[in-house]
């Protein structure tokens, strides 16, 4: 039912506020004792997440230009804001420096600190997954 609502909204056939849809889906998943898969479209934990350099760079550029509308739609058929979510840029082995700088800026660190950027970038390249916020915080405190 959730995907029907999303598609009806995208088609302009229904004008419901879908910002609470993720909460409703979680409630149904709990009631049915069936967890939502992280890769489930629009609602899953991985929806609207990227650590890939080229994807993140496009989102970062749109943010830098002040174009939040575009940032919310790049590489996404469904705007994250439609369902009360935001695009999330993470740092992993396929990330570029733009991911690192964006994360640093968003978390109150200096994105122009070249040593810090290099430390995080190199740590990400040595992994096979995205770095956690805790791991990034530790890397920020080193040095």
What are these regions (language model features)?
Residues 1-21:
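C-terminal helical cap(s) of enzyme catalytic domains, especially alpha/beta-barrels
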């Amino acid at each position: 039912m959730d995907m029907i609502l999303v598609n009806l909204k995208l088609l302009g056939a229904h004008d419901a506020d879908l910002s609470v849809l993720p909460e409703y889906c979680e409630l149904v998943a709990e009631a049915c004792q069936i967890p939502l898969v992280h890769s489930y479209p629009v609602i899953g934990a991985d929806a609207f997440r990227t650590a890939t350099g080229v994807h993140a760079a496009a989102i970062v550029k749109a943010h830098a230009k002040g174009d939040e509308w575009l940032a919310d739609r790049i590489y996404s058929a469904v705007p994250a804001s439609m369902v009360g979510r935001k695009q999330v840029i993470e740092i992993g082995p396929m990330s570029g420096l733009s991911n690192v700088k964006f994360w640093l800026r968003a978390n109150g660190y200096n994105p122009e600190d070249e040593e810090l950027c290099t430390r995080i970038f190199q740590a990400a390249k040595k992994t096979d997954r995205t770095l956690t916020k805790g791991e990034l915080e530790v890397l920020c405190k080193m040095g």
